[in-house]
Protein backbone atom coordinates (compact mmCIF):
# COMPACT_ATOMS: atom_id res chain seq x y z
CA UNK A 1 0.00 0.00 0.00
CA UNK A 2 1.45 3.36 -1.07
CA UNK A 3 1.14 6.05 1.60
CA UNK A 4 0.46 9.46 0.09
CA UNK A 5 0.47 13.01 1.41
CA UNK A 6 -1.19 15.90 -0.44
CA UNK A 7 -0.25 19.59 -0.40
CA UNK A 8 -2.85 22.29 -0.97
CA UNK A 9 -5.29 19.87 0.64
CA UNK A 10 -8.07 22.45 1.01
CA UNK A 11 -7.74 23.74 -2.56
CA UNK A 12 -9.61 22.69 -5.68
CA UNK A 13 -6.95 20.27 -6.91
CA UNK A 14 -6.01 18.99 -3.47
CA UNK A 15 -9.62 18.13 -2.70
CA UNK A 16 -10.04 16.19 -5.95
CA UNK A 17 -6.77 14.31 -5.39
CA UNK A 18 -7.90 13.30 -1.90
CA UNK A 19 -11.20 12.09 -3.37
CA UNK A 20 -9.48 10.05 -6.11
CA UNK A 21 -7.06 8.50 -3.58
CA UNK A 22 -10.08 7.29 -1.62
CA UNK A 23 -11.48 5.59 -4.72
CA UNK A 24 -8.20 3.98 -5.85
CA UNK A 25 -6.83 0.62 -4.74
CA UNK A 26 -3.24 0.36 -3.58
CA UNK A 27 -2.89 3.88 -2.19
CA UNK A 28 -4.01 5.59 1.00
CA UNK A 29 -3.94 9.15 2.34
CA UNK A 30 -1.71 9.56 5.40
CA UNK A 31 -1.22 13.34 5.43
CA UNK A 32 -2.68 16.62 4.23
CA UNK A 33 -0.82 19.93 4.10
CA UNK A 34 -1.79 23.61 3.89
CA UNK A 35 0.15 26.81 4.55
CA UNK A 36 0.58 28.04 8.10
CA UNK A 37 -2.19 30.67 7.98
CA UNK A 38 -4.85 28.65 6.20
CA UNK A 39 -8.33 28.57 7.72
CA UNK A 40 -8.58 24.78 7.29
CA UNK A 41 -5.66 23.88 9.57
CA UNK A 42 -6.75 21.31 12.14
CA UNK A 43 -9.84 20.34 10.18
CA UNK A 44 -10.44 16.85 8.84
CA UNK A 45 -9.02 16.58 5.30
CA UNK A 46 -11.87 14.36 4.14
CA UNK A 47 -14.57 16.69 5.39
CA UNK A 48 -12.88 19.70 3.76
CA UNK A 49 -12.63 17.73 0.50
CA UNK A 50 -16.28 16.75 0.72
CA UNK A 51 -15.69 13.00 0.98
CA UNK A 52 -16.50 12.48 4.65
CA UNK A 53 -14.40 12.15 7.77
CA UNK A 54 -11.01 10.46 7.22
CA UNK A 55 -9.39 11.04 10.60
CA UNK A 56 -6.52 13.02 9.04
CA UNK A 57 -6.07 16.62 10.15
CA UNK A 58 -4.78 19.25 7.75
CA UNK A 59 -1.35 20.35 8.98
CA UNK A 60 1.28 22.95 8.09
CA UNK A 61 4.11 20.74 9.38
CA UNK A 62 5.55 19.50 6.08
CA UNK A 63 8.42 17.66 7.76
CA UNK A 64 6.17 15.61 10.04
CA UNK A 65 3.71 14.76 7.25
CA UNK A 66 6.33 13.79 4.66
CA UNK A 67 8.15 11.63 7.20
CA UNK A 68 5.22 9.22 7.45
CA UNK A 69 4.41 9.15 3.71
CA UNK A 70 5.95 7.28 0.77
CA UNK A 71 5.12 9.97 -1.79
CA UNK A 72 4.16 13.64 -1.70
CA UNK A 73 1.69 14.91 -4.32
CA UNK A 74 2.31 18.63 -4.75
CA UNK A 75 0.18 21.10 -6.74
CA UNK A 76 1.25 24.47 -5.34
CA UNK A 77 3.62 27.15 -6.65
CA UNK A 78 7.28 26.91 -7.76
CA UNK A 79 8.85 28.41 -4.62
CA UNK A 80 6.66 26.29 -2.33
CA UNK A 81 7.32 23.17 -4.39
CA UNK A 82 11.09 23.62 -4.12
CA UNK A 83 10.83 23.99 -0.34
CA UNK A 84 8.68 20.86 -0.16
CA UNK A 85 11.05 18.90 -2.40
CA UNK A 86 13.92 19.70 -0.04
CA UNK A 87 11.93 18.01 2.74
CA UNK A 88 11.11 15.04 0.49
CA UNK A 89 14.82 14.69 -0.28
CA UNK A 90 15.73 14.90 3.41
CA UNK A 91 13.50 11.90 4.18
CA UNK A 92 14.37 10.00 0.96
CA UNK A 93 10.75 9.87 -0.19
CA UNK A 94 9.20 10.29 -3.66
CA UNK A 95 7.25 13.17 -5.18
CA UNK A 96 4.67 13.90 -7.87
CA UNK A 97 4.78 17.56 -8.90
CA UNK A 98 1.99 19.27 -10.83
CA UNK A 99 2.99 22.87 -10.10
CA UNK A 100 3.61 25.11 -13.13
CA UNK A 101 5.32 28.42 -13.88
CA UNK A 102 8.89 27.43 -12.99
CA UNK A 103 11.66 29.75 -14.14
CA UNK A 104 14.78 28.31 -15.71
CA UNK A 105 16.69 28.68 -12.44
CA UNK A 106 13.88 27.05 -10.47
CA UNK A 107 13.79 24.07 -12.84
CA UNK A 108 17.53 23.64 -12.39
CA UNK A 109 16.96 23.50 -8.62
CA UNK A 110 14.22 20.91 -9.10
CA UNK A 111 16.56 18.79 -11.23
CA UNK A 112 19.28 19.05 -8.63
CA UNK A 113 16.99 17.84 -5.85
CA UNK A 114 15.52 15.11 -8.06
CA UNK A 115 18.97 13.58 -8.49
CA UNK A 116 18.51 12.27 -4.93
CA UNK A 117 14.88 11.15 -5.09
CA UNK A 118 12.40 9.66 -7.53
CA UNK A 119 10.26 12.53 -8.78
CA UNK A 120 7.61 12.99 -11.45
CA UNK A 121 7.12 16.52 -12.72
CA UNK A 122 4.58 17.29 -15.43
CA UNK A 123 2.69 20.46 -16.31
CA UNK A 124 -0.38 18.35 -16.96
CA UNK A 125 -1.17 14.94 -15.45
CA UNK A 126 -4.02 14.23 -17.87
CA UNK A 127 -3.67 11.01 -19.83
CA UNK A 128 -5.22 12.71 -22.87
CA UNK A 129 -2.83 15.66 -22.78
CA UNK A 130 0.18 13.39 -22.51
CA UNK A 131 -0.99 11.45 -25.55
CA UNK A 132 -1.50 14.83 -27.24
CA UNK A 133 2.17 15.67 -26.62
CA UNK A 134 3.17 12.58 -28.56
CA UNK A 135 0.72 13.34 -31.39
CA UNK A 136 1.94 16.93 -31.67
CA UNK A 137 5.56 15.81 -31.89
CA UNK A 138 4.70 13.28 -34.61
CA UNK A 139 2.64 15.83 -36.57
CA UNK A 140 5.39 18.46 -36.36
CA UNK A 141 8.05 16.01 -37.57
CA UNK A 142 5.87 14.84 -40.44
CA UNK A 143 4.68 18.28 -41.60
CA UNK A 144 8.01 20.03 -41.03
CA UNK A 145 8.70 23.58 -42.19
CA UNK A 146 5.88 23.55 -44.76
CA UNK A 147 3.30 24.12 -42.01
CA UNK A 148 3.04 27.05 -39.57
CA UNK A 149 2.64 26.05 -35.91
CA UNK A 150 0.36 28.06 -33.63
CA UNK A 151 -1.45 27.23 -30.41
CA UNK A 152 -4.11 28.70 -28.14
CA UNK A 153 -4.77 27.83 -24.51
CA UNK A 154 -7.74 28.82 -22.35
CA UNK A 155 -8.08 28.57 -18.56
CA UNK A 156 -10.27 29.94 -15.79
CA UNK A 157 -9.90 33.56 -14.73
CA UNK A 158 -8.12 32.70 -11.46
CA UNK A 159 -5.10 31.00 -13.06
CA UNK A 160 -1.97 32.94 -12.16
CA UNK A 161 0.63 31.90 -14.77
CA UNK A 162 0.52 32.42 -18.52
CA UNK A 163 0.93 30.74 -20.87
CA UNK A 164 -0.04 27.55 -19.11
CA UNK A 165 2.65 25.00 -18.35
CA UNK A 166 0.88 22.62 -20.71
CA UNK A 167 0.97 25.13 -23.57
CA UNK A 168 4.66 25.73 -22.99
CA UNK A 169 5.33 21.99 -23.01
CA UNK A 170 3.36 21.54 -26.23
CA UNK A 171 5.33 24.39 -27.81
CA UNK A 172 8.65 22.90 -26.65
CA UNK A 173 7.72 19.48 -28.02
CA UNK A 174 6.72 20.98 -31.39
CA UNK A 175 9.87 23.11 -31.56
CA UNK A 176 12.13 20.17 -30.74
CA UNK A 177 10.43 18.05 -33.40
CA UNK A 178 11.30 20.56 -36.12
CA UNK A 179 14.76 21.38 -34.79
CA UNK A 180 14.03 24.83 -33.36
CA UNK A 181 14.76 26.51 -30.03
CA UNK A 182 11.51 27.79 -28.51
CA UNK A 183 13.30 30.60 -26.68
CA UNK A 184 14.33 31.95 -30.10
CA UNK A 185 11.16 31.35 -32.14
CA UNK A 186 8.33 31.52 -29.58
CA UNK A 187 5.89 34.41 -30.08
CA UNK A 188 3.63 35.05 -27.09
CA UNK A 189 2.09 38.35 -28.09
CA UNK A 190 1.07 40.10 -31.31
CA UNK A 191 -0.15 43.67 -31.45
CA UNK A 192 0.04 46.46 -33.97
CA UNK A 193 2.05 46.46 -37.17
CA UNK A 194 3.94 43.21 -36.62
CA UNK A 195 4.75 42.50 -40.24
CA UNK A 196 4.46 39.14 -41.95
CA UNK A 197 4.68 36.02 -39.83
CA UNK A 198 8.20 34.62 -39.63
CA UNK A 199 8.55 31.16 -41.18
CA UNK A 200 10.12 29.69 -38.03
CA UNK A 201 7.74 31.29 -35.53
CA UNK A 202 5.73 29.20 -33.08
CA UNK A 203 2.87 31.25 -31.67
CA UNK A 204 1.40 30.64 -28.22
CA UNK A 205 -1.64 32.71 -27.27
CA UNK A 206 -3.42 32.87 -23.90
CA UNK A 207 -7.11 33.30 -23.07
CA UNK A 208 -8.54 33.62 -19.54
CA UNK A 209 -12.15 33.60 -18.42
CA UNK A 210 -14.92 32.00 -16.43
CA UNK A 211 -14.38 28.56 -14.95
CA UNK A 212 -12.66 26.85 -17.90
CA UNK A 213 -10.68 23.88 -16.53
CA UNK A 214 -8.27 23.82 -19.46
CA UNK A 215 -8.45 23.87 -23.27
CA UNK A 216 -5.44 23.49 -25.57
CA UNK A 217 -5.38 23.49 -29.37
CA UNK A 218 -2.32 23.18 -31.59
CA UNK A 219 -2.78 24.32 -35.19
CA UNK A 220 -0.66 23.27 -38.16
CA UNK A 221 -1.44 25.67 -41.02
CA UNK A 222 -0.48 24.56 -44.51
CA UNK A 223 -1.43 25.69 -48.01
CA UNK A 224 -5.04 24.73 -48.62
CA UNK A 225 -5.35 22.70 -45.43
CA UNK A 226 -4.82 22.76 -41.69
CA UNK A 227 -4.57 20.19 -38.94
CA UNK A 228 -5.91 20.88 -35.44
CA UNK A 229 -5.14 18.80 -32.36
CA UNK A 230 -7.31 19.72 -29.38
CA UNK A 231 -7.70 18.62 -25.80
CA UNK A 232 -10.45 19.94 -23.53
CA UNK A 233 -10.55 19.15 -19.83
CA UNK A 234 -14.02 19.37 -18.31
CA UNK A 235 -13.14 18.17 -14.80
CA UNK A 236 -10.13 18.47 -12.49
CA UNK A 237 -10.55 14.75 -11.86
CA UNK A 238 -8.61 14.09 -15.06
CA UNK A 239 -5.54 15.74 -13.48
CA UNK A 240 -6.16 14.17 -10.07
CA UNK A 241 -6.47 10.69 -11.58
CA UNK A 242 -3.19 11.12 -13.45
CA UNK A 243 -1.44 12.38 -10.31
CA UNK A 244 -2.59 9.37 -8.31
CA UNK A 245 -1.55 7.03 -11.13
CA UNK A 246 1.85 8.73 -11.01
CA UNK A 247 2.09 8.28 -7.24
CA UNK A 248 1.45 4.55 -7.60
CA UNK A 249 4.03 4.29 -10.38
CA UNK A 250 6.85 6.34 -8.80
CA UNK A 251 6.91 4.56 -5.46
CA UNK A 252 10.09 2.48 -5.29
CA UNK A 253 11.59 3.84 -8.52
CA UNK A 254 15.28 4.75 -8.74
CA UNK A 255 16.21 8.41 -8.08
CA UNK A 256 15.71 10.67 -11.07
CA UNK A 257 13.33 13.06 -12.78
CA UNK A 258 10.44 11.40 -14.61
CA UNK A 259 7.32 12.66 -16.38
CA UNK A 260 3.89 11.33 -17.31
CA UNK A 261 5.25 10.02 -20.58
CA UNK A 262 7.29 7.57 -18.47
CA UNK A 263 4.25 6.67 -16.35
CA UNK A 264 2.08 5.97 -19.38
CA UNK A 265 4.76 4.14 -21.38
CA UNK A 266 4.64 6.69 -24.21
CA UNK A 267 8.39 7.06 -24.66
Regions found by a protein language model. Give the residues of each.
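Extreme N-terminal starter segment of soluble prokaryotic enzymes
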Residues: 1-4
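Rossmann-like NAD(P)-binding element
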Residues: 63-83, 89, 93-94
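Short glycine-/small-residue-rich Rossmann-like dinucleotide-binding loops
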Residues: 70, 76-77, 100, 206-208
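Residue-level detector of anion-binding/catalytic polar loops
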Residues: 71, 94, 118, 148, ...
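Rossmann-fold NAD(P)-binding glycine/threonine-rich loop
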Residues: 82-91, 98-121, 130-139
Amino acid sequence: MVKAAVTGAAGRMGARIISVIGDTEGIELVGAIEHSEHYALGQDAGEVAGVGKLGIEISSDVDAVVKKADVLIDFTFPDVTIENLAVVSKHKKSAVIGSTGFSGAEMEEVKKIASNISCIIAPNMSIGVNLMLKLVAEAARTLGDDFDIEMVETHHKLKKDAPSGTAMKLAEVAADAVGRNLSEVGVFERFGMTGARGKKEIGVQTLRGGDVVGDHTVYFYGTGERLEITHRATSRDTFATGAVKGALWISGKAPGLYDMQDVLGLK
